[in-house]
Amino acid sequence: MRIVKLKRSFYNRPTLEVAVDLLGKILIYIFNGEKLGGRLVELEAYIGQDDPACHAFKGKTSRNEIMYGKAGFLYVYFTYGNHHMLNIVTERAGFPAAVLIRGMEPIYGIETMMKNRGVEKITDISNGPGKLAKALGITTKQKGLDVTGNIITVVDDKKQSDDICCSSRIGIGDNGADKLWRFYIKDNPHVSKTSRKVNNTAKLF
């Protein structure tokens, strides 16, 4: 079956649509000449200056300015003094929004990703955003990479996603906790957490 690389137009759409449509797609990153990556199974949407959980809530800064640029570029930031978070910018230029990649089912370069993470179980490789970035070897040095390029990309192998669930986002406290903007594939072992009130995405659109 033909594998199709996602174009910039895929990301230049409403963030909730992009987040849901990214589930089941395959993220590929070239790390030291080796192909690493896997199937995306968990994502969160962060949308504009009206979203209190979004980095752009208080306006444009040197840290978040890439969110105001064109869709389809990496926004990577360092948090909690230990973790890098991997996001893909969405929507039109000038409107700050992004999708946080929270969980990935490993496919390519599994041994290297285990080594990067220092783990032995495949389900411990990328079941969380910080774990995922570390497994891939992605840091703030990769901030600004074009996701439609050759170093990092997302492809569609036309496989249907399993049941999709949505919930409130993780680790944001009360900031936007009413928004069910976390999307994940039901019962997938590479999802970070499932102990949250869930809903069906059909009720959102």
Model-derived features: positions:
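Conserved, well-structured core segments that form or line functional sites
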Residues: 1-205
